[in-house]
């Protein structure tokens, strides 16, 4: 096995037993692939039948009302974005690019005849159609400067669905759901009548729809029921038995007798094949039936008197005595009736026709029109147009390819081509027929929660739909413009207004329910947010009406949606996470990968199956035992089939799971020993990992699952080498790689990677990248070059490994509280940097412009000490609560001054009294260091000194960066040319003869520009030098162009909102150490609040004097059933012991041979997966050992982890007792505790629920407008609620004065509180109570009822 650059430095010991079959696919592909499909920007490769291309093709051509103009779509181009991703975030801009569409305007001769079109002119040009937001490389969008994610939606797939309402007997219904257009429902009522609804409006008979389609009553009956012939004779009535075979299995309603009146088959018996043979042998072709049975029948076809043409009876009329007499009179002795006798099929259509009052197509169309447009008078043309527009015109109604595929599959017919996206007559007939079959017990209703009936709508599809909405509005505008604009030379630009497209897309990205502010606490929360699948949002469910079934885990979720990771609370089960190996197919259905089993042998061929396909197969688990030839070991195997868990013979197995972790999501796959935890706790664990705050120093988990490197790699926060090569230069801002051109398919000689430094994330955490390579290191493509935030050597590192003792300590771990050692605070283990952004905006007010200036009235010099001359805080200043960050003054309304005051003002040149101090100050409870300042202003008034200074600094930095970049390229080109040319024969060189040998000394005398002028005799060498020369020239031009573009973007004026003159952003870095009140958690849902930070000397310690870091309550484990944490602690202790063993070996010797022996014992004596230490050279072995001193990292994959014996073996090698318990001593007394304590290393996280963000106190502040009571909550600087129960508590103690104070002056007694303030200022400690405002509110509410109630101020003495 080969190891990457980062893996060589720290090899993780693997415990998985199962073979590695398939790599976890790129975790963000659901986002990136979907949007790529939408944009299909590369026209050269041929655009797909999707995305922008298909929307534009469907919307054009647009024809003017008079037919003179036609606008055709030709092609589109997506331009370059104005700013790059980083600049968009700084400027608060949207990362987008202009969409230019090539349109062709065809002008016809207006004098031509109506039926002929003579082309007069064709005009073509590119038309700007708005800006399309671009996706960043990490699958996000930057909208108005903030990073957002569009969450994929799980919605009901287009097609037809049959369901049953359990509240009513026989209430089956069918619903045809299109991708776009009106819904069509058919439903049974309790009487067996079939009703139809369009868009859930008023119901009407289903046969009305059939008549509107052009079917007559006769045709409807012919389609849905069989007919039989009754003959009338002197004896009575006889039913002709035409097709006996069709009657098999039906219940007979009469006796079948032969010519001798012998009963062959009795009444109320189900007809069998044997009975049919008996009847045929007896030669019976008709059977006598009595009139009672005949009178239940109905006529199958219109009965017409052929002589006169008079209609005796219409189809579906009841067979009555008078009707039979009329038939006999005109000589009709045979009557075709609907067969209700020999078939059990219900008479639903016949009964529905009885309710249906319409007689023909026109009446049916009018009926539908009345339902959809009640109150509108129906006109013949509009009636037909309305109905056709509902289901039969593709621009208004589309099933889409998915809907058509699902509809054809459900009805089991391919009569309709898969390219037809509107409804056909056969579809509607087929749906009603299937509904009747289901009512008759011959079919099944659909499971709506089956993933074969729900599909994923990803970001590309949603933006496509928004674009379609915008384009539809543009289309209407084009038609209007064509008829209104009278111009000689009309061009496409003159008639296209792109604003509706921009508006539709902007609305979706800024305020759409599924376009969300990215969760950016740590890399895992980013990845999880992008892989989220929501059932909420437009066109989805609402959380109030979603029932238990839709939220529940379904059998089809296996390998597609994670059964664990979902939010707690009202959204539980409605928001899910994609399973680690799942993907979305072209139709939008989720697919899971499986290994194909051929003739009992498991192959490595991978096939992806959707939930619909999977129902038909038998699938074995990933952990099923195989022999060395990949055949099943056991005869009976536990499998899944049709949503059930079954035991079956190995010969029946058709597929096998790819991996044990394929059923869980990325977050759940990070939890070691997941299989030993209760599902509820794992859900909390998976969710809490997303809330972990990245700490100052990242530390890998000692006990991991092997998924850490995958999440870190795919999150996009680590820097990954694009090409193989050698590290030429490294500093904190940049990594330069000299590319190995033989290994990499690139013409670049140099790759330069810029690192992100101290950038604010969406959750105010700090994003920072640190290089992990050194100059001279050889790297391969795909190797990690720099760690992002919460990453350690390319592995996700959300917390720290702490030594945990499961024991009580003086009640400080009561109710999940956590007792911490002071060492953790001292070592800055859980110290995190948070970057807050404070914005100050200077606006143009009615009274004049606001001004950012250091000249502020009534402010001391000390308060302005941290500001520069522009009134903006210096970078590097340490700021406390209340400090001014940006000094700003706002004009006040002018006061009427006396002449004396005006004179004094004029003498002292004092103009400050008409301005108010509205400076931006540090909020209460915060302090930190200013790390960055950004100034944005309009160019109208010229730029301020600070803005110019910042601009100059940015330009100088860019120039320096690009110069350094070019210097690196030059040195690489120089060294590569030197290697090739020294010792070569010269063709032509200044100062040397032809054929002379070029020396190093001669080259050293020449400037590099002259090197490039030398030519050589060897043609191959000349070609190589020529390539290097061209690369150098091109690089020089490219870098100059990049600098000019950068300079232009830095100096470009800022587009500020209307009325805004200047915006200043101040970024303050705040360091937060862990303290009591902060929330911590493990990975198994074991959460708690830090109760006390104890001095190291007081913590319990081991026999060798090592104090523990954390004391956890052992009572938190049995009832919660998350035993995984105990196993993690044991394995963590073993890992720590192995690290100590390596450290001791290093102290004795640094010989690689000795170290290899120790490593061999650690890595290869326990577990099935071996590590090839021979692949590492001696230097790499030493580096590895140095990195393993703190503990040997272990991977125990979910459902395939370390066994009890493995843990015991490792504990033994590490020098610990195999039960993982040890004697501890009390740090305060030095005495041992009574019993041995379970001690181990556990990975603990600090969560983003910090006490600093929650602590809050108020003295005075804002009040509610109506009740005049203080507001609530930290955000409003509110007070504490003194509620009903608190009042009872004071009443119980008889604390009348305290109670009066609480309910009046401290709450809503306006006069009382101002008097109180005055008294405090004056030093008086008295309290005057007035009427609370809440009494006035009550009085006014009572007055609204017409009762005049007032307060009696008079005292009792009077």
From Swiss-Prot:
Keywords: DNA-directed RNA polymerase, Nucleotidyltransferase, Transcription, Transferase. Disulfide bonds: none annotated. GO terms for cellular component: DNA-directed RNA polymerase complex. Its EC number is 2.7.7.6. GO terms for biological process: DNA-templated transcription. The keyword NAD does not apply. Coiled coil: none annotated. GO terms for molecular function: DNA binding; DNA-directed RNA polymerase activity; ribonucleoside binding. Pfam families: RNA_pol_Rpb2_1, RNA_pol_Rpb2_2, RNA_pol_Rpb2_3, RNA_pol_Rpb2_45, RNA_pol_Rpb2_6, RNA_pol_Rpb2_7. Belongs to the RNA polymerase beta chain family. The RNAP catalytic core consists of 2 alpha, 1 beta, 1 beta' and 1 omega subunit. When a sigma factor is associated with the core the holoenzyme is formed, which can initiate transcription. PANTHER family: DNA-DIRECTED RNA POLYMERASE I SUBUNIT 2. DNA-dependent RNA polymerase catalyzes the transcription of DNA into RNA using the four ribonucleoside triphosphates as substrates. HAMAP family: RNApol_bact_RpoB. This is DNA-directed RNA polymerase subunit beta. It comes from Francisella tularensis subsp. mediasiatica (strain FSC147). The lineage of its organism: Bacteria, Pseudomonadati, Pseudomonadota, Gammaproteobacteria, Thiotrichales. The gene is rpoB.
């Amino acid at each position: 096995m080969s190891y990457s650059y980062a893996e060589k430095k720290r090899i993780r010991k693997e415990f998985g037993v199962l073979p590695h079959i398939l790599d976890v696919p790129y975790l963000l592909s659901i986002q990136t692939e979907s949007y790529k499909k939408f944009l299909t920007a590369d026209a050269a490769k041929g655009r797909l039948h999707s995305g922008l291309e298909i929307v534009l093709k469907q919307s054009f051509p647009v024809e003017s009302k008079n037919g003179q103009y036609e606008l055709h779509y030709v092609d589109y181009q997506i331009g370059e974005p104005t700013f790059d991703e980083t600049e968009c975030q700084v400027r608060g801009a949207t990362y987008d690019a202009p969409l230019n569409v090539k349109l062709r305007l065809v002008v016809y001769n207006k004098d031509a005849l109506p039926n002929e079109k003579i082309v007069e002119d064709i005009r073509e040009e590119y038309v700007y159609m708005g800006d399309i937001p671009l996706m960043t490389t990490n699958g996000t969008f930057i909208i108005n400067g903030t990073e957002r994610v569009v969450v994929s939606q799980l919605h009901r797939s287009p097609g037809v669905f049959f369901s049953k309402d359990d509240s009513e007997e026989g209430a089956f219904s069918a619903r045809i759901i299109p991708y776009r257009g009106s819904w069509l429902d058919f439903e049974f009522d309790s009487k067996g009548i079939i009703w139809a609804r369009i868009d859930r409006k008023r119901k009407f008979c289903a046969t009305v729809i059939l008549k509107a389609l052009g079917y007559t009553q006769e045709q409807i009956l012919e389609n849905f029921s069989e007919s039989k012939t009754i003959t009338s004779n002197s004896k009575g009535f006889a039913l002709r038995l035409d097709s006996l075979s069709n009657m098999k299995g039906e219940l007979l309603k009469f006796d079948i007798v032969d010519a001798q009146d012998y009963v062959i088959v009795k009444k109320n018996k189900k007809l069998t094949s044997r009975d049919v043979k008996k009847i045929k042998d007896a030669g019976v072709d008709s059977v006598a039936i009595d009139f009672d049975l005949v009178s239940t029948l109905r006529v199958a076809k219109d009965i017409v008197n052929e002589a006169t043409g008079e209609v005796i009876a219409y189809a579906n009329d009841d067979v009555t005595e008078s009707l039979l007499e009329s038939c006999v009179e005109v000589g009709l002795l045979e009557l075709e009736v609907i067969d209700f006798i020999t078939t059990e099929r219900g008479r639903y259509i016949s009964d529905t026709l009885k309710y249906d009052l319409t007689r023909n197509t026109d009446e049916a169309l009018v009926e539908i029109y009345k339902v959809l447009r009640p109150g509108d008078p129906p006109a013949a043309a509009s009636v037909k147009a309305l109905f056709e527009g509902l289901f039969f015109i593709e621009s208004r109604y589309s099933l889409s390819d998915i809907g058509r595929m699902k509809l054809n599959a459900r009805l089991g017919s391919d009569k309709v081509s898969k390219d037809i996206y509107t409804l056909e007559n056969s579809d509607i007939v087929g749906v009603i027929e299937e509904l009747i079959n289901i009512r008759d017990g011959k079919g099944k209703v659909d499971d709506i929660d089956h993933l074969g009936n729900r599909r994923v709508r990803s970001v590309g599809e949603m933006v496509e739909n928004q674009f379609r909405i915008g384009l539809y509005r543009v289309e209407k505008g084009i038609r209007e413009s064509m008829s209104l604009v009278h111009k000689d030379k009309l061009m496409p630009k003159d008639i296209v207004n792109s604003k509706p497209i921009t508006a539709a897309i902007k609305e979706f990205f800024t305020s759409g329910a599924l376009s969300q502010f990215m969760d950016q606490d740590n890399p895992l929360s980013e990845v999880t947010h992008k892989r989220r699948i929501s059932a909420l949002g437009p066109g989805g469910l609402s959380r109030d009406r979603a029932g238990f079934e839709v939220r529940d885990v379904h059998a089809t979720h296996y390998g597609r949606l994670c059964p664990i990771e979902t939010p707690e609370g009202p959204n539980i089960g409605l928001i899910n996470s994609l399973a680690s190996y799942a993907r979305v197919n072209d139709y939008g259905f989720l697919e899971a990968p499986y290994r194909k089993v051929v003739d009992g042998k498991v192959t490595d061929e991978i096939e992806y199956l959707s939930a619909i396909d999977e129902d038909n197969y038998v699938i074995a688990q990933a952990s099923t035992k195989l022999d060395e030839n990949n055949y099943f070991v056991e005869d009976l195997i536990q499998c899944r089939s049709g949503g059930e868990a079954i035991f079956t013979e190995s010969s029946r197995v058709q597929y096998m799971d790819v991996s044990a972790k394929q059923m869980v999501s990325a977050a759940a796959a990070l939890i070691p020993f997941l299989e030993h935890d209760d599902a509820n706790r794992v859900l909390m664990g998976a969710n809490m990992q997303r809330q972990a705050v990245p700490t100052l120093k990242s530390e890998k988990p000692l006990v991991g699952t092997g998924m850490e490197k995958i999440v870190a790699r795919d999150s996009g926060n680590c820097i990954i080498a694009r090409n193989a090569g050698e590290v030429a230069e490294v500093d904190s801002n940049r990594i330069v790689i000299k590319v190995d051109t033989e290994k990499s398919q690139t013409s670049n000689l140099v790759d330069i990677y810029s690192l992100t430094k101290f950038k604010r994330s969406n959750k105010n955490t700090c994003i920072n990248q640190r290089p992990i390579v050194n100059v001279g290191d050889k790297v391969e493509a795909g190797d990690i070059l720099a760690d992002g935030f919460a990453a350690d050597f390319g592995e996700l590192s959300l917390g720290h490994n702490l030594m945990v003792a499961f024991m009580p300590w003086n009640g400080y771990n009561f109710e999940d509280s956590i007792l911490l050692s002071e060492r953790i605070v001292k070592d800055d283990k859980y110290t995190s940097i948070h970057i807050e952004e404070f914005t100050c905006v200077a606006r143009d007010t009615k009274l004049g412009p606001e001004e950012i200036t250091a000249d502020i009235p009534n402010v001391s010099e000390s308060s302005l000490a941290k500001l520069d001359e522009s009134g903006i805080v210096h970078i590097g200043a340490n700021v406390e609560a209340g400090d001014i960050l940006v000094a700003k003054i706002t004009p006040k309304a002018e006061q009427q001054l006396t002449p004396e005051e005006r004179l004094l003002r004029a003498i002292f040149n004092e103009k400050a009294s008409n301005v108010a101090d509205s400076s931006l100050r540090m909020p209460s409870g915060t302090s930190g260091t200013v790390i960055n300042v950004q100034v944005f202003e309009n160019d109208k008034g010229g730029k301020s000194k600070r803005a110019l200074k910042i601009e100059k600094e940015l330009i100088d930095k860019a120039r320096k960066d690009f110069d350094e970049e070019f210097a690196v390229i030059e040195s690489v080109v120089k060294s590569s040319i030197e290697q090739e040319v020294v010792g070569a024969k010269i063709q032509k060189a200044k100062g040397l003869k032809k054929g002379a040998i070029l020396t190093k000394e001669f080259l050293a005398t020449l400037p590099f520009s002259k090197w490039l002028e030398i030519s050589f005799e060897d043609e191959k060498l000349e070609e190589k030098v020529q390539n290097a020369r061209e690369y150098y020239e091109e690089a020089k031009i490219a870098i100059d162009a990049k600098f000019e573009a950068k300079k232009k973007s830095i100096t470009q004026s800022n587009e500020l909102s209307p009325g805004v003159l200047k915006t200043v952003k101040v970024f303050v870095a705040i360091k937060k150490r862990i303290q009591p009140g902060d929330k911590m958690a493990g990975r198994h849902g074991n959460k708690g609040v830090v109760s006390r930070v104890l001095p190291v000397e007081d913590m319990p310690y081991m026999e060798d004097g090592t104090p523990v870091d954390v004391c956890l309550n052992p009572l938190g484990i049995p009832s919660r059933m998350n035993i995984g944490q105990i196993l993690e602690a044991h394995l963590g202790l073993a890992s720590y012991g192995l690290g100590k063993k390596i450290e001791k070996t290093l102290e004795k010797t640094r010989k690689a041979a000795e170290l290899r022996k120790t490593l061999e014992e650690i890595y290869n004596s326990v577990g099935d997966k071996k590590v090839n230490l021979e692949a590492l050279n001696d230097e790499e072995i030493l580096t590895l050992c140095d990195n393993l001193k703190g503990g040997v990292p272990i991977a125990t994959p979910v459902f395939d982890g370390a066994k009890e014996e493995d843990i015991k073996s490792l504990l033994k090698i590490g020098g610990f007792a195999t039960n993982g318990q040890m004697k501890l001593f009390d740090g305060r007394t030095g005495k041992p505790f009574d019993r041995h304590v379970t001690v181990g290393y556990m990975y603990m996280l600090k969560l983003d629920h910090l006490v600093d963000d929650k602590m809050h106190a108020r003295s005075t502040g804002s009040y509610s407008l109506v009740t005049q009571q203080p507001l609530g909550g930290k955000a409003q600087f509110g007070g504490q609620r003194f509620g009903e129960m608190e009042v009872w508590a004071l009443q119980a103690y008889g604390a009348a004065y305290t109670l009066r104070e609480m309910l009046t002056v401290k709450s809503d007694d306006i006069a009382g509180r101002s008097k109180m303030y005055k008294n405090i200022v004056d030093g008086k400690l008295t309290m005057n109570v007035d009427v609370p405002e809440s009494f006035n509110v009550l009085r006014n509410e009572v007055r609204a009822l017409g009762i005049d109630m007032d307060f009696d101020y008079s005292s009792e003495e009077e």
